[in-house]
């Protein structure tokens, strides 16, 4: 791919799309690929019998339900830049996967439903972005439907998300009366049109200059009021400030309709120019700059069985510095060993190509035979660890019941591989033979159950179990750890990394145990460092 893609790390634009479920994120992802030339025809995400399934929703359950369950990675060239788009789960049960994905991007695109405004999941994701001072573009979607007043939406974004809004495009009408959008910086009106059901690109008329007499002909009943509205907007609205955007303090706001392909191209063109190139990343030892010659990278996601024909596991690695070349040897810091990477991959969702080269900001896929974990750092020899890639204590627990006892080996293999992806965890109590699965949301159990059956030919069911919460255990010394284990064996388990975990039957039990053992650290999250 290197013959059509820029080889300069400064041309990389690596970002994630964040939104509440049903705000149109997966549809927008499709349309970005359409405008980027990565796909020729956009498939409707839900429903229509003749429509293709959305390119980024390749897992069977995602195709059936029309929700994004795992993060896909897609790369395409656009206006001289290389766009690396990480599609995150839209369903709240998969917030862990989304959180980790946000550690691998340099900016984010927030999608808001023009009728619903700022919703709960958007608020949570913005909190994560704020912690990392991630620059945010905003796309207010579904302009082809009746929604709230644009100014009201801007006010809500500023009030609820604590970020200034700088309108860049502004709608002329909405719903059935939608006529177009006006780009304030380009002083250009783009008239509303749609491709065939939104499946292909179809440009409407463009008029340069808000004072152009052509607008009086095309919009005789509303153009005077609209000119006044824009005059008012320029006076009271925030002008776009690039530095404030890069600091995560201000978001440029675009309006459009992803399903109609409208307003998307204007936003994507600006994004390619304004979004930041790869940024420095912190490690336990020092900060790594993208322009450094030697390659460094970290694994933020593992996906099992992306292709049932291959029965594979792919580790997704973000390149933070240097250049990856096919066949090069890398140092896997956690294991202290050198590994050869002969056949790394790049992605167009489930489509894969062998990567000959990759640069800072790019995401590559490495075949994983059980030795790579989320959070692993790869270098050309230097011992350092990238930080900030989290695991979360599960909120929900189920006991795994196997329907065919002869399938136990396949069950353990399947659970181990699916847990490697980080979306679910399983625990083996020190006493007894139970297998306990932990997750953030109920949907994760359904996904694991379906994937065990589809990918590993293992049928099982999940039963409720008397576990309220879990905490990773650390002790100041071996003596304190042994005392703790001796007195709490009934509530202790090992996770799939053989880390010791306290599984509490109730919140009260956890609190009392913490009070009885003040020297023991009970961690609700853990970093993937050197485990």
Swiss-Prot record:
tr-type G domain segment(s): 10-279
Binding site for GTP: 19-26, 87-91, 141-144
Keywords, sorted A to Z: Cytoplasm, GTP-binding, Nucleotide-binding, Protein biosynthesis
GO cellular component terms listed in the entry, alphabetical order: cytosol
A GO molecular-function annotation: GTPase activity
HAMAP family associated with the record: Rel_fac_3
Primary role: Increases the formation of ribosomal termination complexes and stimulates activities of RF-1 and RF-2. It binds guanine nucleotides and has strong preference for UGA stop codons. It may interact directly with the ribosome. The stimulation of RF-1 and RF-2 is significantly reduced by GTP and GDP, but not by GMP.
Name of the protein described by the UniProt record: Peptide chain release factor 3
Encoding gene, per UniProt annotation: prfC
């Amino acid at each position: 791919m290197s013959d059509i893609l820029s080889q300069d790390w400064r041309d990389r634009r690596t970002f994630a799309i964040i939104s509440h479920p049903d705000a149109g994120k997966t549809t927008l992802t499709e349309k970005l690929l359409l405008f980027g030339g990565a796909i020729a025809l956009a498939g409707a995400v839900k429903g229509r019998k003749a429509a293709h399934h959305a390119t980024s929703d390749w897992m069977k359950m995602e195709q059936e339900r029309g929700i994004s369950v795992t993060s896909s990675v897609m790369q395409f060239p656009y206006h001289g830049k290389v766009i690396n788009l990480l599609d995150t789960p839209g369903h709240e049960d998969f917030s862990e996967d989304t959180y980790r994905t946000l550690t691998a991007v340099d900016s984010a695109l927030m999608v808001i439903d023009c009728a619903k405004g700022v919703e709960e999941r958007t608020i949570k994701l913005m909190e994560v972005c704020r912690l990392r001072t991630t620059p945010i573009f905003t796309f207010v979607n579904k302009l082809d439907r009746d929604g709230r007043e644009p100014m009201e939406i801007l006010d809500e974004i500023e009030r609820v998300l604590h970020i200034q809004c700088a309108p860049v495009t502004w709608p002329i009408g909405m719903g059935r009366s939608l006529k177009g959008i006006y780009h304030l910086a380009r002083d250009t009106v783009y008239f509303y049109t749609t491709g065939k059901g939104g499946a292909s690109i179809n440009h409407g008329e463009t008029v340069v200059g808000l004072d152009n007499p052509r607008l009086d002909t095309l919009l005789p009943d509303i153009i005077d009021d609209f000119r006044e509205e824009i005059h008012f907007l320029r006076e009271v609205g925030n002008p776009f400030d690039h530095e404030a955007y890069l600091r995560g303090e201000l978001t440029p706001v675009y309006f459009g309709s992803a399903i109609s392909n409208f307003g998307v191209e204007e936003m994507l063109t600006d994004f390619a120019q304004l979004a930041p190139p790869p940024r420095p990343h912190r490690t336990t030892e020092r900060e790594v700059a993208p322009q450094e010659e030697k390659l460094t990278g970290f694994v933020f996601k593992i996906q099992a069985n992306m292709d049932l024909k291959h029965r594979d596991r792919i580790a997704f690695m973000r390149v933070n510095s240097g250049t990856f070349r096919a066949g090069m040897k890398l140092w896997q810091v956690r294991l202290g060993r050198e590994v050869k990477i002969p056949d790394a991959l790049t992605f167009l969702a489930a489509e894969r190509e062998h990567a000959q080269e990759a640069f800072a900001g790019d995401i590559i896929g490495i075949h994983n035979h059980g030795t790579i974990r989320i959070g692993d750092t790869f270098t050309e020899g230097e011992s350092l660890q990238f930080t900030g890639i989290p695991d979360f204590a599960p909120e929900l627990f189920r006991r795994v019941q196997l329907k065919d006892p002869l399938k136990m080996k396949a069950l353990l293999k399947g659970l181990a591989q699916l847990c490697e992806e980080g979306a679910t965890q399983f625990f083996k109590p020190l006493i007894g033979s139970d297998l306990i699965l932990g997750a953030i949301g109920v949907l994760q159990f359904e996904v694991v159950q379906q994937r065990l059956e589809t990918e590993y030919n293992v049928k099982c069911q999940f039963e409720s179990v008397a576990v309220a919460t879990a905490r990773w255990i650390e002790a100041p010394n071996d003596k304190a750890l042994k005392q703790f284990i001796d007195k709490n064996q009934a509530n202790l388990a090992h996770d799939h990394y053989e880390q010791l975990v306290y599984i509490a039957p109730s919140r009260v039990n956890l609190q009392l145990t913490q009070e009885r053992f003040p020297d023991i650290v009970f961690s609700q999250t853990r970093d993937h460092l050197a485990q």
